[in-house]
From Swiss-Prot:
Alphabetical GO biological process terms: cysteinyl-tRNA aminoacylation
Subcellular location: Cytoplasm
Taxon lineage: Bacteria, Pseudomonadati, Spirochaetota, Spirochaetia, Leptospirales
Complex and partners: Monomer.
Protein name, per record: Cysteine--tRNA ligase
Coiled-coil region: none
Catalytic activity: tRNA(Cys) + L-cysteine + ATP = L-cysteinyl-tRNA(Cys) + AMP + diphosphate
UniProt keyword terms in alphabetical order: Aminoacyl-tRNA synthetase, ATP-binding, Cytoplasm, Ligase, Metal-binding, Nucleotide-binding, Protein biosynthesis, Zinc
Cofactor note: Binds 1 zinc ion per subunit.
Recorded GO MF terms: ATP binding; cysteine-tRNA ligase activity; zinc ion binding
Organism: Leptospira borgpetersenii serovar Hardjo-bovis (strain JB197)
Length: 474
């Protein structure tokens, strides 16, 4: 088990990660609001959770992770009423689409995906405890949290509530940091067809912020080691979660470490439908983009840095995957019967150093970009070694290199470890290359170019090197 340093949004600095139980690190992540397809900004946040999960496991920790499904909020109620469907009928297809998107980008599935509507009793329990603490008041049949009565309000977002006018409040779920007001815990129905529950605190439905506090309590009993989400959720959502949970259960620790992933830009601009740069994963796949390249790009930058999504960056991601895969394919041609072993013990001094540097990069606040530098340094060395030996290396050496690439891919999840070698196809390619060489000797450049184009159309690239002609698959 390797010591990890995380940047904790609560303290504003890197800290040694000290989970209550390293063999069961508890993690809660804010998931999708299922009223439409997730956009690629959402996807970056979801893939950050995937990198966190994979990194914790690779560094020796056990995990118990949750991502919620928000299946009741203002937007869902608005759109379900417009479509004349029940909440469940409306949200089920969007929930299924979310899981399909996760599969498309090879995200590992978590232990829990609770729906907000499944935790109404836990929400009522929190409200009742807050009422007992004197932190709740009623107005127009809605229940509100009085933030001025909670001493610790603002400790995550570092806002100052001293200038807030007493009794000002918000009924909507989302609002700006510059306009702090009391937030709603429980809303009475205002429109015909609006979903509601009959409870001991009144007929209504939960405010968005209450939902996550309740789901954490239902699954974990108290608090969690790590809570993640996009930086846009830091205020008001996560600040309000703290207020509710610590207000209701002041004797308990709610969250030890807060991790927030930064915004995604598209072609250097904030994503917006009005700008025409708003994309879902399905939009991009429909345009012919490789899901592996999308995944690789979205996880390649440090999670606390803004990431620019562009056609050039996607092309770069595709090229980088090809570089790694081409090196792997060369090795698989040598050691065709290799089995990937997650518990493999590296023997070579070089691979041991790469493994250590890769782990240290991830343990440094999930520094994936630094880890990638280790990957490409090792690729350069492996390819140079294979070139110097003209691919005539022992299977044991090839296997060592294959295992280190597999180790890297436990984070990136983009490689194919099935051998691409097919003797029949290879012999045909070799025959065509020999024919091309003959054509070039005879100065039949038209025939030479035609063979090159024929091979290229089949995904075969020819490289003229000082050691002779080498070919590889794209």
């Amino acid at each position: 088990m390797i010591e990890i340093q995380f940047y904790n949004s609560l303290s504003g600095k890197k800290e040694k990660f000290s989970p209550a139980n390293p063999h069961r690190v508890t993690v809660y992540s804010c998931g999708p609001t299922v009223y439409n397809f997730a956009h690629i900004g959402n996807l970056r946040a979801f893939l950050f959770v995937d990198v966190l999960r994979r990194s914790l496991k690779l560094l020796g920790y056990g995990v118990d992770m949750t991502m919620n499904i928000t299946d009741i909020d203002d937007k869902i109620i608005r759109d379900s009423i417009a479509s004349q469907k029940s909440i469940q009928e409306f949200t089920t297809p969007w929930t299924e689409a979310f899981f399909e998107d996760l599969k498309t980008v090879s995200a590992e599935f978590l232990e829990h995906y609770p729906k907000a509507t499944e935790s109404i009793p836990e929400m009522i329990q929190i409200i009742q405890r807050l009422q007992n603490q004197g932190l709740v008041y009623e107005k127009d049949e809605n229940l509100y949290f009085s933030i001025q009565k909670f001493e610790g309000y603002g400790k995550l977002s570092k806002i100052d509530t001293s200038g807030m006018k007493t009794g000002t409040r918000y009924d909507t779920d989302e609002y700006d940091k510059e306009d702090v007001r009391d937030f709603v815990l429980w809303k009475s129905p205002k429109r015909k067809g609006e979903a509601s529950w009959k409870t001991s605190v009144g007929t209504g439905r939960p405010g968005w912020h209450l939902e996550c506090s309740a789901m954490i309590r239902k699954i974990y009993g108290s608090g969690v080691d790590i809570h993640t989400g996009g930086v846009d959720l830091l205020f008001p959502h996560h600040e309000n979660e703290i207020a509710q949970s610590e207000g209701a259960f002041p004797e308990e620790s709610f969250v030890r470490t807060w991790l927030h992933s930064e915004h995604l830009l598209v072609e250097g601009q904030k994503m917006s439908k009005s700008k025409g740069n708003f994309y879902t994963l399905r939009d991009l796949v429909g345009q012919g983009l490789d899901p592996k390249a999308i995944r690789f790009l979205l996880i390649s930058a440090h999670y606390r840095s803004k990431l620019n999504f562009s056609t050039d960056r996607i092309a770069e991601a595709s090229a980088n995957i090809r570089k790694i895969q081409n090196c792997l394919d060369r090795l698989l041609d040598i050691a065709q019967n290799v089995k990937i072993d997650p518990s493999y013990s590296f023997n070579d001094e070089l691979t041991l150093r790469w493994k250590k540097e890769f782990e240290e990069s991830l343990a440094d606040d999930l520094n994936v970009s630094k880890a990638l530098a280790v990957v490409f340094e090792s690729l350069k060395t492996i390819n140079a070694f294979l070139d110097s030996k003209k691919n005539r290396v022992a299977e044991i050496s090839a296997n060592e290199f294959i295992q280190i690439l597999a180790y890297y891919d436990r984070i990136f999840g983009v490689l194919n470890f099935e051998s691409q070698k097919d003797p029949l196809i290879d012999s045909e390619i070799d025959s065509l290359i020999q024919e091309r060489q003959t054509a070039r000797k005879n100065k039949d450049f038209a025939r030479s170019d035609a063979i090159r184009d024929q091979l290229l159309a089949q995904g075969i690239l020819i490289e003229d090197t000082k050691d002779g002609i080498r070919w590889r698959r794209k």
